[in-house]
Amino acid sequence: MLERDREQMSVFVAHVDGGSHGSPGPSGIGVVLQDSEGEKIRISKWIGHQDNNVAEYAALLEALQHALRLKAKVLRVFSDSQVVVRQMTGEYACRSPRLYSLHWTCRKLARSLEFSIFHIEREHNSEANQLAHHAVRSRSFRV
């Protein structure tokens, strides 16, 4: 395998979503992680009783951790959470004590990659959203 091919295989795209039924309330995350070949890993995970922003950060953290386990070099993340996207890009400061440790951990992991994060409308994040809602309904973990 050529080095260029190996580098292409280490490029991942993630769609992430966190959801809470009530805020705080029963919460779950959904992550769709896709490699450069188009293969997808879908993660649906119950995270207990949280608020929506904690759930959104938990979804991003799961994507970062999974991408690093897969030896990703590049990770492009798409999220419908303006708070998470704007805090991760530095447009907003993270002043919330309940979000700060998640934000800090995500920033630290993101520095290990060529990382970018983009805001998308909710209707363009439906697969991750369905996985998050499934986790809340079933209170389970699935990869």
Annotated model-derived regions:
Residues 5-54, 65-69, 73:
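RNase H-like nuclease fold core
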Residues 1-6, 100:
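N-terminal intrinsically disordered, compositionally biased regulatory/targeting segments
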Residues 49-56, 95-99:
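Active-site beta-loop-alpha junctions of metal-dependent nucleic acid enzymes
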Residues 1-3, 44-47, 85-88:
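A generic short-segment signal for beta-strand/edge and adjacent turn/coil regions
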